[in-house]
Amino acid sequence: MMHLILADSELELMPEEIKKGRILLDSSLHHSLMKGLKDWKRRGRPDIVHIFLLIAQESILNKEGLLRTYVHTRNNEIIYVNPEMRIIKNYNRFKGLMQQLLIHGKVPLKGGSLMKMKKERLDELLNKIKAKKIVFSRKGKRKALQDVFEENVACIIGGFPSGNFISSVEKYADEIIRLHEEMLPAWIVAMEAIVAYENFMKLHL
């Protein structure tokens, strides 16, 4: 089983210090309002979460029942994604869904949840996952993923456009891996990790 975690993702409601109202923060729409926020240049990026989830949830690995996906936010919330969740491809509709999730803690509001959110730190989640933990970072070593994977593995990927993890992820890592000399988008790292694990598990034979 692969546990795929998007850590320190920049998914949040608009902070009250810039505007009251429960609206999803999006840097493409709220750029001028965000300049007074700490770390404003990296915040308000639901697009990263959207593309990451599209790739993860539509993967062969997920269809084979071997993937569990989580999104950890800068405000220490964990979003648990049901493997049966099919991500809305329209970005504006996806943002509406994320806004509803951040306000109410689950979607859909009635019936079984396809996504649920709880207040939880990244280390609390990692302590519950009994698997080898691999952090993807430019600070890591270049290694072939086939050489570091085990049958149960947790892959931690940064959910931010630039910079470093806010959380102390390195202290929980069994391996810190660098895929490339340049910083790669989160969804590319996720895609590389998923396909490498599919090959490790011989799903393409």
Task: Show the residue positions of the predicted features.
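Long, charge-patterned amphipathic alpha-helical coiled-coil/hairpin "stalk" segments used as oligomerization
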Residues: F136-L145, V153-N164
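Structured adenosyl-cofactor binding patch, chiefly the S-adenosyl-L-methionine
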Residues: P161-L205
